Amino acid sequence: MYNVGKIVNTHGLIGEIRVIATTDFPEERFQVGNTVYLFEKNSKKPEKLIIRSHRKHKNFDLLMFEGLTGIHQVERMKEGVLKIKETQQTDLEENEFYFHEIIGCTVVTTDGEELGEIIEILTPGANDVWVVKGADKKEKLIPYIADVVKEINTNDKKITIEVMEGLLD
């Protein structure tokens, strides 16, 4: 299962929850009628939930679920995580990848030098930035742009980059 949101609080008295989306597709993931799975804090057993309503409010997604109509029924969800099954993922365009496909990949240069493993993806704006942790425990920031990233092989968990001047300084 894959994370699509973290519940940070309740909202109002009618059973809405406040979610920070961890998906690039919140409008699609949180569409009315869709199923998500709640993993409450300190629980390994998921609860299947069907989305009854979705709206944006500031930087949050506000959700309500079928059968849950009051704050007293959703307070327990605080700090929980919403997930979807792998079969619920949508197909991506060419050269688009899910974060979970990229995180854990080994990054090597076109000269064959291994730089480390991608441990995180930042989304600051125009393009994603991959955080690569090397054997020396230092983190390097690699922009996901065509001039740098030359090949992505998610099956082998290997990414080849061309090191531009100043990139690793």
UniProtKB/Swiss-Prot annotation:
It comes from the Bacteria. Its main location: cytoplasm. One of its GO terms (molecular function) is ribosome binding. One of its GO terms (cellular component) is ribosome. One of its GO terms (biological process) is ribosomal small subunit biogenesis. InterPro entries: PRC-brl_dom, PRC_barrel-like_sf, RimM, RimM_N, RimM_N_sf, Transl_B-barrel_sf. It is found in: Cytoplasm. Keywords: Chaperone, Cytoplasm, Ribosome biogenesis, rRNA processing. Residues 94-167 form the PRC barrel domain. Pfam families: PRC, RimM. The PRC barrel domain binds ribosomal protein uS19. Belongs to the RimM family. An accessory protein needed during the final step in the assembly of 30S ribosomal subunit, possibly for assembly of the head region. Essential for efficient processing of 16S rRNA. May be needed both before and after RbfA during the maturation of 16S rRNA. It has affinity for free ribosomal 30S subunits but not for 70S ribosomes. Binds ribosomal protein uS19. This is Ribosome maturation factor RimM. It comes from Listeria welshimeri serovar 6b (strain ATCC 35897 / DSM 20650 / CCUG 15529 / CIP 8149 / NCTC 11857 / SLCC 5334 / V8).
